[in-house]
């Protein structure tokens, strides 16, 4: 067959299979569509907090904020929403990813991003609002535009600070803010960043600058350990806890609703058991829920299915490695992992002696590892007569013993 024709037929067959699943498209895109808030995964209460912070800052009461939550909870998506919400209002907005840099390198990145994201167009011309300052702006831009990963030697920190101050106080409209969005801010919680955090003590008090940092639940504690005064500079904490079960169901429902063909039922093509499995296993983490649903749909398309049941969801979780069992395996040391895998090969339970013989290791070594795994709650102990049997938890049984069954589809 002609390769072009083959590709065209494959593409049209996917559209047909998608239709059988009662979907117009796969609504579980993990990457947020920039500027599209239809697939928002957070809560209205979090948006309200951000709105209040922005409103207060516009009236002179600037309070920098940390957006904290576990991996995959939607912190980057929240920064994305702040970016577009504030950009539409005409504020200057700068997106940065935290890294271990000196204050001077941070200032250079900030200055460059302010210029390229707010003042200079993609074609390299200055926006009409700022033409009266064109000479000085172009001078800054020329110094920074070609530096790449190198720090321009001819641009001392004092001059950078003066140029930044000039942009904020003279070029930016006085009724607008300069909003700095910093993702993965845990990178700053290192001793090598002490000088940068000390610089933040004064910088985060600058008038007209509002900063949002996103990081793990322990972000503020970790930053404060390195530099105690930083706590006062970031007084607001927006906590993003995992979704409740109801919120998890709602997230899936909202996404499906948008993609359904006419006549589809609430959670189609997922069965009730499949949805329940996703909600139970994904711990309220939006990224896990979205990835599992997306992978399940991909498997269903590949196999020409019309329904997605619990078996398909298990296969999706297996291929993604995001079930609770997989998380436990990732947490174990190689020696501990070897022992639980051996237990699975022995049917899910074994004595110290059986494992020692099977793995050809001393009973004392096996016993030490088993005690550690037992203390973590990943295996259980049961006495049968004179013997003590160690048994895999349900989560480990599902992933280690259920693997073969799951893949025979």
Swiss-Prot record:
Q: Which residues form the signal peptide?
A: none
SMART domains, from UniProt? AAA, HTH_ARSR
Q: Which SUPFAM superfamilies match?
A: P-loop containing nucleoside triphosphate hydrolases, Winged helix' DNA-binding domain
Q: Which UniProt keywords apply?
A: DNA-binding, Transcription, Transcription regulation
- Xref: InterPro entries: AAA+_ATPase, AAA_16, ArsR-like_HTH, ExeA_AAA_ATPase_DNA-bind, HTH_ArsR_DNA-bd_dom, P-loop_NTPase, WH-like_DNA-bd_sf, WH_DNA-bd_sf
Per the record's keyword annotation, is Transport included, yes or no? Answer: no
UniProt domain HTH arsR-type: residue ranges = 305-409
Protein's name according to its UniProt entry: Uncharacterized HTH-type transcriptional regulator MJ0774
- The scientific name of the source species is Methanocaldococcus jannaschii (strain ATCC 43067 / DSM 2661 / JAL-1 / JCM 10045 / NBRC 100440) (Methanococcus jannaschii)
């Amino acid at each position: 067959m002609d390769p072009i024709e083959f590709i065209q037929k494959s593409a049209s067959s996917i559209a047909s299979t998608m239709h059988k699943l009662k979907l117009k498209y796969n609504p579980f895109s993990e990457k947020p569509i920039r500027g599209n808030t239809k697939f928002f995964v957070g809560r209205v209460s979090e948006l309200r907090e951000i709105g209040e912070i922005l409103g207060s800052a516009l009236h002179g009461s600037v309070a920098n904020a940390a957006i904290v939550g576990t991996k995959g909870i939607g912190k980057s998506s929240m920064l994305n929403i702040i970016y577009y919400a504030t950009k539409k209002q005409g504020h200057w907005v700068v997106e940065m990813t935290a890294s271990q840099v000196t204050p001077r390198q941070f200032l250079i990145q900030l200055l460059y991003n302010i210029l390229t994201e707010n003042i200079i167009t993609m074609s390299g011309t200055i926006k009409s609002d700022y033409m009266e300052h064109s000479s000085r702006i172009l001078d800054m831009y020329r110094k920074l535009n070609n530096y790449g990963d190198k720090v321009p030697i001819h641009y001392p920190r004092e001059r950078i600070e003066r140029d930044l101050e000039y942009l904020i106080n003279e070029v930016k409209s006085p009724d607008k803010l300069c909003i700095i969005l910093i993702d993965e801010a845990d990178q700053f919680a290192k001793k090598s960043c002490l000088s940068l955090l000390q610089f933040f003590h004064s910088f985060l008090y600058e008038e007209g600058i509002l900063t949002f940092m996103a990081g793990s639940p322990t972000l503020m504690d970790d930053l404060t350990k390195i530099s105690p005064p930083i706590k006062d500079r970031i007084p607001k904490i927006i906590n993003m806890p995992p979704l409740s079960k109801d919120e998890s169901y709602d997230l899936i429902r909202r996404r499906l609703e948008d993609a359904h063909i006419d006549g589809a039922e609430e959670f189609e093509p997922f069965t009730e058991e499949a949805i329940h499995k996703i909600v139970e296993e994904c711990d309220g983490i939006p990224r896990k829920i979205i990835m599992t649903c997306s992978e399940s749909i991909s498997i269903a398309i590949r196999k020409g299915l019309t329904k997605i049941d619990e078996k398909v969801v298990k296969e999706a979780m297996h291929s993604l490695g995001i079930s609770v069992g997989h998380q436990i395996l990732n947490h174990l040391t190689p020696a501990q992992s070897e022992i639980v895998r051996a237990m699975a090969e022995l049917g899910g339970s074994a004595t110290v002696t059986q494992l020692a013989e099977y793995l050809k290791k001393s009973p004392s070594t096996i016993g030490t590892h088993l005690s550690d795994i037992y203390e973590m709650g990943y295996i259980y102990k049961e006495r049968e007569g004179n013997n003590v049997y160690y048994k895999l938890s349900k989560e480990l049984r599902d992933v280690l013993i259920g693997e073969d069954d799951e893949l025979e589809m």
